[in-house]
Each structure stands twice: as C-alpha cells, then as structure tokens.
Amino acid sequence: MNEQVNENKIQIVIIDDHQLFREGVKRILAMEPEFEVVADGEDGENAVELVEKYNPDVILMDINMPKVNGVEATRDLIQRYPDVKVLVLSIHDDESYVTHVLKTGASGYLLKEMDADALIEAVKVVAQGGAYIHPKVTHNLIKEYRRLVNEDEQESSEIGFKEVEYRKPLHILTRRECEVLQLMTDGYSNRMIGEALYISEKTVKNHVSNILQKMNVNDRTQAVVESIKNGWVKVR
C-alpha cells in the first residue's frame, strides 16, 4: 500500500462521475469517526487504480459512468480482489436491474435517494462482511419473489399437486420482534421502524440483532426472504 492510512478505521473509496455527489457523500461519511475516505475517482478505470493503490475496505460505486461503467468495474474488481466489498450506488430500483448488478458480486445496493443514516449503516454492514439492500429495493425484490412463488403454486395446483402449506409464524420471536420483522418486510429502515413503534433506533437495532440470531441468518435481507418463503409475514 503506497499511502499512509489509518488501519483502525474503515477505509473507503468513492467512485462517481459527479464531483458534487462525491463531495456530498464525503461530508456525510466524515460525520462518522469510524470512517476514512482515502480517495475518490470519476469512473471504473479509476476504481481499479485506486483499489490497487489504497486497498480500501469498502468501495462506493456508481453505475452509470463514462469509459468503464460500475457494473464492469465491480465485476473486474471482484475477480481480482475477491475480498473487496463493493456497495453500489444507483438511481435504479427495478428488481431486474438490481439482480443483474448483484450478480457481479457486489455486497450491497443503495439508492442515491438514501439519507445519511442509511448510507452510514450500509457502509458498516458491508465492511463487516454483511449484505445491505436499500429498503425500497428490498420491497420490490420481495414483491417480485412473491409473484414468482404464487405463479409456481398456481402451476403446481393445476397439475394436481397440493399447494404448499406455510408454517405458522416463528414462535421463538417475541411480539415486538414480530412487529419489527413485519416492518422490515415492508421496507422500513431502522429509523422508520423506531418512529412507527415509538421506540429508539438503538432498541430497533437490538431487536433486529435478536431476530437475526434466532433465525440463524446473517443479515436483514436473508431474514425477510426467509420469512416470506415460510409465510411468517405479509407482503403488503
């Protein structure tokens, strides 16, 4: 590594072709003492160069850029550096587009309409090896997944198979944890869940942690998908 960086902090590289957006993201990340933005660039070529130079923990990657776009750059980086964590930043919330991007090996997908809390939370989750999907995107993915499940059930019924009977909600979750899980499915962020249930964001995080532990999953996206698959929550 050619540059001096603070190894006790989460080192971040920002790649986006709009300088004003990069500067705005820098200001948000600067509010978090655990973060250090070590470099930024304007296209996919810069991304490869900066990763080689700084060996960051997390790369914030735009998609629509000149020269080498974010999808190509992410695929190239993951192939060269399998341990690198790429958090994609995009304006697109279409589930087919998101799925295409995630197939490159990206660790997360965040819409550019995100607030500061969501950005900070996403970087922390991805840096720790988890996956983070923007709540709005998660909701769209879940609706598409649910549609496909319903189609499969209908096809099975038509050829004489019994419809799969969903298991009852998890008895190991408390009432409050079930409420939090439902709101997670609805696409709520931790802050929004806290406002809806009149509890602090810290309490919400504790509930989410307990849910993940009890369900034996790594992140909230897995928890939501598993819950829908088993009929523990409603897709609204």
From Swiss-Prot:
Q: Please indicate which superkingdom the organism of origin belongs to.
A: Bacteria
Q: Which UniProt keywords apply?
A: Activator, Cytoplasm, DNA-binding, Phosphoprotein, Repressor, Transcription, Transcription regulation, Two-component regulatory system
User: InterPro entries, from UniProt?
Assistant: CheY-like_superfamily, Sig_transdc_resp-reg_C-effctor, Sig_transdc_resp-reg_receiver, Tscrpt_reg_LuxR_C, WalR-like
Query: Where is this chain's protein located in or outside the cell?
Result: Cytoplasm
Which residues are annotated with the PTM 4-aspartylphosphate? 62
Post-translational note: Phosphorylated and dephosphorylated by DegS.
Q: Which residues form the HTH luxR-type domain?
A: 166-231
Instruction: Indicate yes or no for the key word Transmembrane.
Output: no
One GO-annotated biological process of the protein: phosphorelay signal transduction system
Q: List the disulfide bonds.
A: none
DNA-binding region coordinates: 190-209
Boundaries of every Response regulatory domain copy: 11-127
Q: Which GO terms describe its molecular function?
A: DNA binding
The UniProt entry's GO CC annotations, sorted and at most eight, read: cytoplasm
* Main localization, broad class: cytoplasm
Please indicate if the UniProt record lists Transferase as a keyword.
no
| UniProt function note | Member of the two-component regulatory system DegS/DegU, which plays an important role in the transition growth phase.
What is the protein's name according to its record? Transcriptional regulatory protein DegU
Which organism does this sequence originate in? Brevibacillus brevis
Taxonomic classification: Bacteria, Bacillati, Bacillota, Bacilli, Bacillales
